[in-house]
Amino acid sequence: VGIAKLEGYELAFRRGYLTILPKEGASVEGLIWSVTDHDESQLDCYEGYPTFYDKETLTVTDADGTPHEIMVYTMNAPYRDQLLPVSSRYNAVVLQGCLDAGISPQQFYDADEKYRKAYKARAAPVPKKHAPER
């Protein structure tokens, strides 16, 4: 249907995939799709609903400022709290999707950079404490 903006959320990598997380002052650009009940049923299977992702109804605005109520998949706890590796293939598909849709890839780059820093910090070895000298 078109490009829209979701206010009050940020794009974030969790458990190797993208999701949206509430964040004051942030926004996420995406596409509004028109889907049939059959399409939604197929998407539910693909997205792992209701175990991996849940569905929420949120309001977005299109380029003309018109509000639209949409359904989005959001990652469930505890999955959204896990930092797992992201595949380069997944990143390439998401980036190409942004470019094909005419969405700025900056939000993807920002989410990727934030994830890499958090993953690296989590994976960093803990320094050993040295025994005091006698």
Residue ranges and their predicted role:
Residues V1-R134:
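Glycine-aromatic micro-motifs
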